[in-house]
Amino acid sequence: GINFHWERNEEQTFEGALKLIIDSDKIWAINILPLENYLSSVISSEMSATSSLELLKAHSVISRSWLLNQIEKHNQSKNEHSNNFFSFTKTDKEIVRWYDREDHSLFDVCADDHCQRYQGISKGITPNAAKAIKETTGEVLLSNNEICDARFSKCCGGATEEYQYCWDNNPKDYLIALKDDKEGTEIDLTSE
């Protein structure tokens, strides 16, 4: 991720088409490829591509749902000619800032952590990862007939948080706070 302690340069290889866009003093290199090919890279980059088939299938559905939800939101905002998205809130006592897909408008998603980790075909896609994508092609998570914003964390530390406490104040009834541990284990969050 950009400006994270694990930021590093890496040589990567991509498939698909390359589109260059000049915006002010920057040149953006955009990789254009089919959704399912993108997902093969994501599930091989976000987690171990040698994980069990069922875990890879679950991740495929989650990542596909998140991606299609973001594209749908982006298209709606373009159709409404709306630039009303702010990735921060400010009160007299605090400023809360989060990084989101809306922080870029020239392309659907990026390879940074606020979107999904995408590293092209550099990491190699295992037969199980390819099988997971193929067996779940087109499958998404729905809530009230809408594609879910299926955000996830690679490492939750034993607890998840409600959507509105991490991103914009727009609660999602399917993204709730849960403990992710053995039954009966107490988690000490006093030093968090």
Where are these regions (language model features)?
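Conserved, single-site charged/polar hotspot
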Residues: 1-192
